[in-house]
Structure formats: C-alpha cells, structure tokens
C-alpha cells in the first residue's frame, strides 16, 4: 500500500472547466512527503463516479485518498467533516439523473466522518496565508455522493484514510458570476499539496476549534 489517490471532477452545470480537475491534474505524477500522487478524473454522474473511484482504489491500493470538488460561491478551501447517506439533487447530473431523497447505500449508516486530520489541515493552510475552514456539509449532490461512497468503501480497506475538500471557482469562472469569490489555481495547488503532506504525517487530528454556530 503506497501513494496518494487524488480525484477531481469533470465540468458540470454549464461550466466549461472544473477547478478541481484543473488543479488535481497538475499534481499527477508528483511526489509529496515521499509518496507518489496519482490523479483520476471522476464523472459528475451519480453511481458512475463511485464506479470509477472504486476501480482506481482497487487498482492503485493507495494509502490516502482525497477527493476534490468545485463549490462555486464558497470563499475558501473547505475541508469537509461529514458525508450523509442521501442523494437529493437540486440540478441534474451530467447524464440527466436527478435523484431525490435516495440513499447512497441502502441500509448504510446515516453518515460517515472524514478520516483526514481536517483541523490540522485547516490550521496549516491558514498558517500559509490560504483561506480555509472546516465545512459541516458537503451538500447532497455528486460531491457528497462521492465522499460518502469513498468513506463507506474505506471501511473494508484497512489503514487507508480519506476525505473530501471543496474549492472555490477559478477567477475565470467567477468573472461570469459577478460578485462571486474565486481562488487562483496556484493557491489551490499549494493548498492541496499542503493538505496531502499534513494528512500523510498526521493520523490523529489536532484538538482545535472548527465548529459552526449555524
């Protein structure tokens, strides 16, 4: 077991790019903390995204898996705490599927928590001057679908940790959405490199505040 599996998504909802893949693909083949990084693109499609992810996990046998997704409108790097066992799509996926109140895993737990050191990652990012926070919801679209499915899968992969990170739009995307926040590719790349390094060296999270009042 070795290496880091890093995933990003194809564009969706009318966008021509997805910042998660634009950044993740730059890290493919790099070394971080002595571990090779392998990037894979996931389709923005319920079910299919997990099929591609599971195949990559079986093929690569990574020690760490971090899925990355676009969260247009968010102002910072959002390190997700929890995924819930429901698909409730406000918009269709890239194959026109729009499940409503559908379990991701029939009979599965209501939620799975990230096994990344989420607060340590946020602290390290802030120390580098990168806006970051712990997020309490990954939504109910394909990102949450992938996060829940990933963590469910990892229950049978002893010693493998994983989680999900949401990132803002790129500046070029935000230009088409006046008033919306963005983050430069180079900053997001540094954030992901930092998150991977922290996750590789720290298996137990730091005891830091990171909750929300609402």
From Swiss-Prot:
Catalysed conversion reaction: Release of an N-terminal pyroglutamyl group from a polypeptide, the second amino acid generally not being Pro
Protein name per its UniProtKB record: Pyrrolidone-carboxylate peptidase
Family indicated by similarity: Belongs to the peptidase C15 family.
Keyword Magnesium: no
Coiled-coil residues: none
UniProt keyword annotation of Hydrolase present: yes
A Pfam family reported for this protein in Swiss-Prot or TrEMBL: Peptidase_C15
Active-site residues (renumbered): 80, 143, 166
Listed GO MF terms: pyroglutamyl-peptidase activity
Keywords associated with the record: Cytoplasm, Hydrolase, Protease, Thiol protease
UniProt-listed PROSITE patterns: PYRASE_CYS, PYRASE_GLU
Cell location: Cytoplasm
Gene: pcp
Domain of life of the organism encoding this protein: Bacteria
Source organism: Klebsiella pneumoniae (strain 342)
Function description: Removes 5-oxoproline from various penultimate amino acid residues except L-proline.
EC number of the protein: 3.4.19.3
GO annotation, cellular component aspect: cytosol
